[in-house]
Amino acid sequence: MKTVAIDLGAARSGLAISDESGLLARPLKTVPTKELPDELRQLTADGVSRFVVGRPRTLDGELGKQAAWVDTQVERLKVAAPANYEYEDETGSTAESAAHGDDSDAGAARVILQGYLDART
């Protein structure tokens, strides 16, 4: 079963997808956030049943305003594209992606997804 990670942004969002084995993540694409519901509907039609959404924490490790915004967006996405939605800490994902030569939103989503997959194997 393939899993897709979402690095949500106000203007654009990055997507990454796992391989069939659920061991490796790769960047998929970056889309305008306003088009994300349609994109997720298509992914669910293509057989994706789990979305992992990056949710940031504050420097104190707490969920702050940005996490609350993500939660609100996820509730909207659940209506548009019903599936299993889970959260993964996205702290540092953009910096880690850039350190590996990929400064795209999809690259950050790959970091989020790989962390999620690694924690479950």
Q: What name fits each language-model region?
A:
Residues 2-3, 10-121:
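Phosphate- and other anionic-substrate recognition elements at nucleic-acid/protein interfaces
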